[in-house]
Design a protein with these regions (language model features):
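Structured, active/binding-site neighborhoods that engage oxygen-rich ligands
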Residues: 1-181
Length: 181
């Protein structure tokens, strides 16, 4: 239902104007040349939700994120059950498996159609999409939110746009909840 824009569209697709249960649906993915129809089972999580839950499982009682656990266990194993996911986070997840790499040194290059790119060009929104649990676990502690989100972001992204975007999103979550409960 994420692509339905009005109740008429819901009625046409599902026979009902209000959705109260999960439905299996199909989505075209993969682009023009290598596209395919992905069957999304009722109740399935998106890649963003999967990684958000991975981050949540990595948070200690005191609000700190076990970044090594997230990187070497959650992120590395995510590839076995990932639903979708962008190129940036998938490559980072593959590269974090190297024994010589730590959560704070996941530096890599990768080939694309246009040449060779490196982690510093990884500026997508994958980091921002998973940081909600960090902000919620540290409400009211902006410095801790910034630090934990920065550390979590650099595991998969090297471009300042991705890192600062995730930090700004975490700050916004904190401020909205603190000042508009």
């Amino acid at each position: 239902t994420e692509f339905e824009t009005n109740t008429q569209s819901l009625k046409e697709k599902f026979g009902n104007a209000r959705i109260e249960e999960f439905h299996t649906w199909e989505k075209k993915v993969g682009g023009r040349f290598y596209g395919y129809v992905d069957i999304i089972e009722a109740g399935s999580y998106s890649d963003d939700t999967q990684l958000l839950l991975s981050v949540a499982r990595s948070i200690k009682k005191n609000g700190e994120v076990d970044h090594n656990y997230f990187a070497k266990v959650e992120l590395a194993n995510w590839l076995t059950y990932a639903r979708g996911g962008g190129r940036t986070v998938k490559i980072a997840a593959e590269k974090i498996k190297r024994k010589s790499v730590t959560w704070f040194s996941n530096f890599y290059t990768y080939k694309t159609n246009g040449g060779i790119l490196d982690y510093r060009q990884s500026g997508a929104n994958g980091a921002a999409m998973r940081i909600l649990p960090i902000a919620l676990a540290n409400l009211g502690n902006v410095e801790k939110i910034k630090e934990e989100i920065f550390c979590n972001s650099i595991i998969t992204h090297g471009h300042p746009r991705a890192i600062l975007g995730a930090m700004l999103y975490g700050y916004a979550i904190d401020q909205i909840i603190i000042f508009r409960p």
